[in-house]
């Protein structure tokens, strides 16, 4: 899952990429991706994100089967969406979409673990988040540390995929070197196909730990399914001030959302917890469950698990 060549500055070429299970590094040329270390800090305020129109209808049929047996929910998928996609390869993502052949298992009866498991480790992406009901995986963390492929590589500062030019299409998705199409942020075209009514919660997928994933909306009173449905808000915000880095070992410049670490979680700021979820009733779980929410604002796709993630969503050697 599990990249992309963008032009670069000051004579350097660098590569943007996300991650996949067997090889989280999508960089085919072994070049550094971060802007010239030692650049003026004002450069870090240039937050450039470009997405490509979704004007291509794939000829490959989408495959998604779900079965339940004992304590396991099993998906058989090919990672091909049923919605239109961007043009791949493109000038920032040199890979073509191809069908995968995957069988994925998650816990049918998940339990909260008592501690959070991050999708990103100190060495890079550790897990993909989950799978949508069209068989495409949600994989929000990019393998884009500060100083990548240099002695200053620093995953304490990792580029936010949706805020940088990674060759994403209008559904915030792009393609791995192995051909796997995957979402880094709100899967716009998929949500359009779900066509969620404004007054209903709509299940959009399952997280790697087995808990359900909904898009944006939930009951205004978490445990009352007769209460008004509203757009649920994340409890993250941009930090104020400037990054503490020196521009060599870590980035400097004003916090502007270019890096994941430009954001901070503030308990109670919104409706959702640090994992971008909450406990409450849903149409599928009238007695209540923990559930995650994909929001249009950061973090979009959640960055933590409250339960124990399936090994089928593990990325790379982390």
List PLM regions with ranges.
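Solvent-exposed N-terminal domain segments of exported/luminal and surface proteins
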Residues: 22-165
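Sec-dependent signal peptide recognition
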Residues: 2-10
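Short, flexible domain-boundary/linker segments around small modular repeats
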Residues: 133-171, 246-278
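C-terminal motif of bacterial Sec signal peptides marking the signal peptidase cleavage site
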Residues: 15-18
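Extended, compositionally biased non-globular segments
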Residues: 209-211, 216-317
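Extracellular/lumenal glycan-associated surfaces
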Residues: 106, 132-136, 177-190, 285-299
């Amino acid at each position: 899952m599990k990249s992309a060549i963008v032009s670069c500055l000051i004579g350097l070429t660098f590569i943007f990429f996300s991650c996949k299970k067997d090889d989280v590094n999508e960089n085919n040329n072994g070049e550094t991706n971060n802007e010239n270390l030692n650049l003026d800090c004002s450069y870090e305020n240039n937050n450039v994100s470009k997405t490509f129109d979704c004007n291509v209808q794939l000829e490959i049929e989408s495959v998604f089967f779900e079965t339940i047996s004992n304590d396991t929910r099993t998906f058989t998928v090919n990672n091909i969406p049923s919605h239109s996609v961007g043009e791949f390869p493109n000038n920032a993502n040199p890979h073509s979409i191809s069908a995968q052949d995957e069988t994925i298992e998650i816990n049918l009866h998940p339990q909260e673990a008592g501690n959070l498991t991050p999708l990103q480790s100190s060495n890079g992406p550790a897990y993909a988040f989950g799978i949508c009901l069209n068989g495409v995986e949600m994989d929000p963390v990019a393998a884009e540390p500060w100083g990548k492929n240099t002695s200053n590589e620093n995953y304490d500062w990792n580029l936010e995929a949706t805020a940088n030019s990674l060759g994403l299409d209008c559904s915030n998705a792009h393609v791995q070197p192995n051909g796997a199409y995957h979402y880094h942020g709100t899967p716009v075209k998929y949500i359009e196909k779900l066509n969620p009514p404004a007054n209903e919660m709509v299940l959009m997928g399952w997280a790697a730990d087995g808990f359900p994933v909904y898009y944006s909306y939930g009951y205004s009173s978490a445990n009352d399914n007769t209460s008004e449905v509203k757009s649920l808000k994340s409890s993250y915000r941009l930090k104020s001030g400037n990054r503490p880095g020196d521009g060599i070992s870590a980035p400097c410049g004003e916090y502007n959302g270019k890096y994941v670490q430009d954001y901070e979680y503030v308990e109670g700021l919104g409706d959702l917890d640090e994992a971008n979820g909450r406990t409450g009733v849903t149409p599928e779980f009238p007695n209540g469950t923990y559930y995650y929410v994909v929001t249009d604002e950061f973090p979009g796709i959640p960055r933590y698990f409250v339960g124990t993630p399936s090994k089928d969503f593990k990325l790379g050697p982390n």
